[in-house]
Amino acid sequence: MQTTKERFIAALQDAETTTLANYQSSWSGLTEDQVEENRESYGENVLTKGQESSIWKRIVESIINPFTVILLLIALVSLVTNVWLAKPGEEDPTTSLIIVVLVLLSGGIRFVQELRSDKAASNLSRMIVNTATVIREGKEAEIPIDEIVVGDLIKLSAGDMIPADVVLLDSRDFFVQQSGLTGESDAVEKVCLKKATSQNLDSLLESESLAFMGTNVISGRATALVLVVGDETMMGAIEQTINTYDEPTSFEREMNTISWLLIRLMMVMVPIVFFINGLTDGDWLEAGVFALSVGVGLTPEMLPMIITASLAKGSIIMAKEKVVIKKLNAIQDLGAIDILCTDKTGTLTQDEIVLEYPLDIHGELDLSVLRRAYLNSYFQTGLKNLMDRAIISRTEREAKKHEIVRGLDQSFQKIDELPFDFERRRMSVIVKDEQGLVSMVTKGALEEMLAVSRYVEYKDEIIPLTDQVREEVLAEVAQLNEQGLRVLGVSYKSNLEEGYAFEVADEADMILTGYLAFLDPPKPSAAPAINILAEYGVATKILTGDNEKVTQAVCEKVGLDVDRILLGSDIDSLSDQELAQAVETTTVFAKLSPDQKARIILQLKANGHKVGYMGDGINDAPSMKVADVGISVDTAVDIAKETADVILLDKDLMVLEKGLVEGRKVYANMTKYIKMTVSSNFGNIFSLLFASIFLPFLPMAPIHLIVLNLVYDLSCIALPFDRVDKDFLKKPRIWEAKSITRFMAWFGPISSVFDILTFIILYFVIVPMITGYGYVHGADSAGLFIMLFQTGWFIESMWSQTMVIYMLRSPKLPFVQSRPAFAVMATTLLGALLVTFLPYGPLASLLKVAPLNALYFLLLAGVLFLYMASVTLVKHYYIGKYKEWL
């Protein structure tokens, strides 16, 4: 079988018939049997998204991370000291076994949760299908792109994403954007084999007749033969190269910052604890194990699982609300946006455009204008937009009553066309009638139509387009625009030569025959949706290619501020500094090109905003790519769906409100876990430092620290499902590592104060009361004294960490103004009770814990009450000082 490059070169050099025959194809396309044969021979049209990990590799990845490596290192050191170096008969592998079991337990939970999340993400991705038009057995069919095979004939037009590497057999004004492959920003014209003047065989990307998977059609049409599919395509080769490089999102970068913050803190605290304990007790091996345990105590081991569970839960909930999250992290990014930029059509309006009036230049109904508009819309081969469909629909209705617009598709023949592009903002078709008369009919934005017209037609009379006539036309159209009607101009010229290769330059000296007034009424839900988004701290900005009059009329109906409208021409005249100010004070931008839309979004981001962009057209793809969150709809063109992070199954701003809320819930519950866990653990470290200096023994055994940390983490497993206060959801939420550091510094030391109070109670009251004596270093009774002391702090630490969850999860008064979810209460209290009853159960001797008396628990209740009261006071001060909570 030929290599990919050999197939490309052969297709460029051989005759069309030979190339088709090489792949069992013809101008009628493949048969079903040939499809299966070619799929078997050349493979499926699916890109491998990196090498999929085996189940065993995924299990290992779930278990092994920097924190569990430390745990396993502690287990190994414990095994050496307590088994290999122990005296005969005193071997005790308990600590090592417990650590290994806890590592496997936490890793197993993470593995199961990530497996469920991956399955959910896979199910969501199946809801969005990109399709292509193929010719098989002489008939056109729309099929998913992964069903395309080598040898298929495919039809391509504006808005399509090219689904495989192809050679063009027929083309007309076919322009492709292939910056994703070449880095070249300008669209490139591709021509079919018979029109090509030269083919660059050394650099196939520059070949005139080859087009490649992943590039998108800007304008024109083509019929192409599929040469290469799947991983063998140019895009497939690049995918294989970059699969190991995954650019982190802003959310991932912040999470990495948080992880490194904890690691740096651990690297500072561990040596301090190690040296203090080593110098105090002289047992450097025990000091090393304890110091490593302190490191583990600082780390939220369940953080990856909490993040994954939170994002997956949010995505699944959004799927039920007709929102598909293509990338899990996008759900959190959606909650962070403070500006939503969107096109007007279909978002503010009903996306069901109706042709209200085909008018002559004086604003009178004229079906001859509709007749010419129909020829333009019907015969053009590009992407038929809503206005094209409205023209065709109106003509079909009028044809039942009026001869002038009847049977046009039969009485005219298409000769050529000049496809639409965003620079000209118009498109032309060249047609021939039954008498052989060749005409060009052009339709487009009125300003552009006036620019190419030299005459106007009124009641079959052709007169020059004078300045006075131009002003009359513009005044008439302005009145229509003020009513919210969108207007296109229609021009023509006749008596053209057949067989001539028409060019854009031929769109000149035309006759303006009239214009078309379209109604695209506002959605009833648009105004309430904009108000709701504003309540959630999200400003809506309109970025449209439509003219300012229509845009103003629609925006006023939905309650948007339109005191100032900035036009595309204004944007081009502004420096970056001037634009930085303009985008802050302007809500509506009109007559924009795709590049101008993207520039506005980039400037908003440079100003510090988190920006979402919602669109569904070819011209929206650049904006979606540069926005923090790209949002599209399932009916969008392929390139828009491919670029988007979020896809709405219902194009309605009201749906986005649910996405914002869910994104902020995800943020809230992840932040709760990180801030509460890190601050509690940070407080424990202060307590350990104090104890290491003033106590003649370790305040908690290494195994106690590890069990405490992991039981607490496991008890937080329900936090992704916690309730979130409505007030908290009203503002955009952005990850900031510095706020975690500040939170930790404020609330960590508070717990240390009450830990020290617990130390005093245990050392001077409770333990002497139970044992009948105080601590005597080296005495036989010292072991029981130490065990009781360590048990007391072990239990107090778990209860204080558990109770503070209820105090810190909300700025409001717990249980009165804000209640946690039942699942959160159940898991956290279960964890606290488990630790409390360990000294009374069969694991007591293994964990080296001992029962305490009733007085201890009575005093513990008092300590916890004082701790909760102190946290409440500091919380109110903190909120007043920093004007934020989580």
Task: List each language-model region with its residue ranges.
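Helix-interface capping motifs at the ends of transmembrane segments in multi-pass membrane proteins
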Residues: 73-98, 261-299, 312-322, 498-501, ...
